[in-house]
Amino acid sequence: TAKIRLVTTDIAEALDGAEVVYFTAPSYGQKAFFDLAVPALSDGQVIVLMPGNYGTLALKAALREAGKDVLVAETDNLPYACAATEPGVVNVRGVKKAVTLAAFPAGDYAAVEAAVDGAFCTGWRKGENVLATSMSGVNMVVHCAPMLANAGRIESEGGHFEFYYAGMTPAVCRLIEATDRERLAVARAYGLDLVSTAQTFRNQYGVEGETLYDVLQANPAFAGFAPKTLHHRFLTEDTPYSM
């Protein structure tokens, strides 16, 4: 445990003296954060986007333009399966065994890993590069297609069902797996050898199962959640910023 030294809306005050900065807002908030943070960052700091969703590419360009010597990294996902339920309240449903971390450029990985070591209870898995980590973020696969497949249920039931269980039937999971095969094919075209969404969840949560459907049904971290509306980050973030 640790005491929170400062809570502030002043970004310059928050960044002053920080060795490592973790940015955990949705992808559609990245640019606004970069615009505010880059002028306040200091040489030698480390900034980690959690997750990256290709944001490190834009951040590195902004830092280069500003003449800042800051280490940049990203993860493929958050260390926790969690969601904000109301202002000031977060429901953490599970903790991942490991998330993938990559630096940009990739050669900075050792310095980044040393800076973030021990910061979270989860482990770090070394990513080949930030393209690999961004394409390993499987939210675009496991969220977008099921949102469309469950559109009627989301609108009629307003979140009162199990999205990852009842909403991801064998047929819906086959649709997810078809989308996943496209993701893996695009990755191979870039020379990347990524694992399937099912294997990603096996690695992250330690669950077992032959198919994606089996893996989802066996994961207690996915219990008790469903979007209440189609205007949800599963579509507004995962479709334009990942897919």
How would you describe each model-predicted region?
Residues 200-207, 213-243:
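Long, low-complexity C-terminal extensions of enzymes
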Residues 172, 179-219:
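Small-residue-rich helix-loop
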Residues 27-88:
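Rossmann-like NAD(P)(H) cofactor-binding subdomain of soluble oxidoreductases
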Residues 17, 23-26, 50, 119:
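Short, well-ordered coil/turn residues at beta-beta hairpins
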Residues 1-18:
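Conserved N-terminal Rossmann-fold NAD(P) cofactor-binding segment
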Residues 79, 84-179:
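Substrate/ligand-engaging "lid" and interaction regions
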Residues 56, 109-113, 172-180, 205, ...:
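Generic structural signal for well-ordered, non-membrane alpha-helical segments
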Residues 15-21, 42-44:
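Short acidic/histidine-rich motifs immediately flanking catalytic phosphotransfer sites
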